[in-house]
A protein has these predicted regions:
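Catalytic domains of cell-wall/extracellular-matrix polysaccharide-remodeling enzymes
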Residues: 1-53, 57, 78-84, 112-115
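Short beta-strand segments
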Residues: 7-14, 65-71, 102-103
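Catalytic cores of secreted or luminal carbohydrate-active enzymes
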Residues: 59, 78-116
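Short acidic, S/G/P-rich loop/turn micro-motifs used as interaction or catalytic elements
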Residues: 73-75
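Short, well-ordered beta-strand segments enriched in hydrophobic/aromatic residues
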Residues: 119, 126-137
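Surface-exposed beta-strand/loop patches in extracellular or lumenal glycoproteins
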Residues: 133-155
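C-terminal beta-strand-rich structural cap/linker in extracellular carbohydrate-active enzymes
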Residues: 169-172
Length: 172
């Protein structure tokens, strides 16, 4: 039955899938959830400290995480106190300069784009041009990517996208 727009992401019922199912479900989708971190109460035994540890491990490994929550104050594996979740959110928010919080769709698209982007590097007289190429479907994959350039010397860096000059952020 046609029920509306086709979802661009998918999480497997009961976290159950195999490679054949994954291949079929992934077709024309940005991403499917194949990993998650269960948080909650009786089953997951989440504490503010355990959630801090999880976030720290993600940051050290330069990875991303998806939580799986079934109940906050009631329901399956509900938190022993909802304050645990709210405190976790506050702590993540306090690190927003170092942590990007996005929807599953945004993060899955960014990761896939980052893995698939190709850079063409061309020398033009005294300048270098770095031209990114992405062969993914532009309707599905349009998250802005970040490029880090390690530059030595006094030369200036100018960045253009579609003929428009972009702001360059210098760090360090």
């Amino acid at each position: 039955a046609e029920i509306g727009e086709r979802p661009l992401t998918f999480c497997y019922p009961f976290n159950s899938y195999n490679e054949d199912v994954r291949r079929i479900v992934s077709e024309n989708r940005i991403g499917t959830r194949i990993k998650q971190y269960a948080i909650g109460g009786e089953k997951s035994k989440s504490t503010v400290e355990s959630l801090d540890k999880w976030v720290k491990e993600l940051m050290i490994s330069n990875d991303w995480g998806v939580t799986m929550i079934h109940g906050i104050s009631t329901g399956y594996d509900a938190f022993t106190s909802p304050d645990i979740l709210w405190e976790h959110f506050r702590r993540v928010k306090n690190q927003e300069y170092d942590i990007w919080v996005g929807t599953f769709r945004e993060v899955a698209a960014y990761v896939k784009e980052r893995r698939n982007v190709q850079l063409d590097i061309v020398k033009k007289e005294s300048q270098w041009a770095v031209i990114p190429r992405l062969l993914l479907d532009k309707e599905l994959f349009n998250e802005p990517l970040t490029m880090v350039l390690n530059k030595k010397g006094k030369g200036k860096v100018k960045v253009y996208q579609n003929g428009k000059r972009l702001l360059v952020k210098k760090t360090g």
